[in-house]
Amino acid sequence: MNVPDDLLYTKSHEWIRREGENIRVGITDHAQAELTDVVFVELPKVGTPAEAQIPIAVVESVKAASDIYAPVKGTVVEANDALTNNPALINTDPFGQGWIFALKIDNADDLKNLQSAQAYKDQIG
C-alpha cells in the first residue's frame, strides 16, 4: 500500500495535505483498494460547514457505500467536480487527481490530532 510520508491521516482512512490555510482531503490507497471500483461520489457543496469526524461526502463502489469524514472543523472551499464524470480517479490516483474536497480550517492546531504516515501504516498493518 502506498502511504506518502508528507501527508496526515485519519483512523477512518482519509488523507490530508496542508496547503496554507486550507487542507485537501481524499481517501487512502488502502481505502480505495477495500472499496474496489468507485462508481459514484457525492461531493460536499462549497460553503458547507464541516465538523470533525462527521460525514461530509459519500463514495460508492460496486461493493459498498462509504462515508467520508471531515478530518477537522472548517468550511468547504472546493470540491473535485472531475469525480462527477470520472469517479474512478479515486482508484487510479487517490493521492492526486482523486482528491475529494478542500477545507479552510478553523484552527490549525486541530491538525495535531491526525496521524502521521507511520502511525497510519501501523494501523493498517
Predicted regions located by residue number:
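Structural motif
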Residues: 22, 73-75
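Short, charge-rich, low-complexity interaction segments located
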Residues: 76-92
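Histidine- and aromatic-rich ligand-binding microenvironments
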Residues: 67-71, 104
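Acidic, low-complexity mobile loops and tails
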Residues: 1-58, 88, 92-125
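Composition-driven detection of intrinsically disordered, low-complexity segments
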Residues: 42, 65-68
